[in-house]
Design a protein with these regions (language model features):
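Polybasic/polar functional segments that serve as interface/processing modules
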Residues: 7-8, 14
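Alpha-helical and His/Cys-centered functional microenvironments
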Residues: 12-13, 227
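An exposed, glycine/acidic-rich loop-and-rim segment of catalytic or binding clefts
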Residues: 23-67, 73-265
């Protein structure tokens, strides 16, 4: 049996999240409250039902500083992230919905775990070990068809199995999904575990591990939308983002990387 293991840590977001400075309402429209010190906890309730009638849980992680992350089993989605700014005011800094129904029809991948393959595959085709595989073409930027974010029913549209955990200075949830051989056209049975961990240092860490029983292609990504002001009605045009990169990948008219590695300046 052949296996493949992938680990994708998401850089801790404490530096970015501490910069939100809006004292108004959160993106979910909830009034702001002062952080409750020392009230760290993990809880779970039913968030809603999938189209086939299965229950989807939502897990609420709260740290010692009042920071709170909500994650649902549907799509391994980050539903909300409420964090204190430098003045201690709480705000939800990610976009999402108050109920599961919003995600059942959403096509923007708010907060989702995207896979098996995040981003685009030209013409919905790839060749592996001499064999060509054909995938659904569910996107067409510039009128050029491609396979996007795992296909018609990617990781963002399936029900994962969640299990919470607690440790010293942290608490989190492991979400597991087994994608059968041939699902959305991909080879190999793939077992994926996504972990969200909220620490008492105001870090939210996202990590994905995947094991396949056959050679396959894989690119699992997290797809949250951020507005560090905590006000979803405002633009992010005044946000500043620094990337420590010397090169980037240019894309063609269909938003497919050309293969060129270009300098940033």
């Amino acid at each position: 049996m052949k296996s493949l293991t992938l680990v994708l840590p998401l850089v801790a977001m404490s530096v970015l999240l501490s910069s939100c400075d809006n004292g108004g309402e959160s993106t979910g429209g909830e009034p702001q409250t002062e952080p409750v010190k020392g009230a760290q906890s993990v809880s779970e309730v039913i968030f809603g039902q999938t189209p086939d009638g299965a229950d989807a849980k939502i897990f609420t992680l709260t740290n010692a500083n009042g920071m709170e992350a909500k994650i649902t089993e549907y799509g391994a989605i980050l539903v909300s992230l409420t964090t204190p700014d430098k003045n201690g005011n709480l705000a939800d800094v990610t976009h999402g919905y108050d109920t599961l129904e919003g995600w059942l029809t959403n096509t923007s991948y708010f907060g989702a775990t995207v896979g098996r393959f995040g981003n685009r595959i030209a013409d919905g085709k790839f060749t592996l070990d001499g064999k060509e595989y054909t995938l659904a073409t569910n996107n067409d930027p510039g009128g050029i068809p491609c396979h996007l974010h795992g296909g018609i029913k990617g990781f963002d549209k399936v029900l994962w199995k969640g299990e919470s955990f607690e440790g010293e200075g942290a608490r989190g949830v492991n979400l597991t999904y087994v994608s059968p051989d041939g699902e959305e056209g991909y080879p190999g049975t793939l077992t994926t575990v996504v972990t969200y961990t909220l620490t008492d240092k105001n870090e939210l860490v996202w990590e994905a591990r995947a094991t396949s029983d056959a050679p396959t292609v894989l690119n699992i990504v997290h797809h949250s939308y951020w507005n560090l002001s905590g006000d979803a009605t405002t633009s992010i045009n005044d946000h500043e983002l620094t990337l420590y990169a010397e090169h980037y990948l240019p894309t063609d008219a269909g938003l497919i990387p050309t293969g060129q590695v270009a300098p940033v300046a």
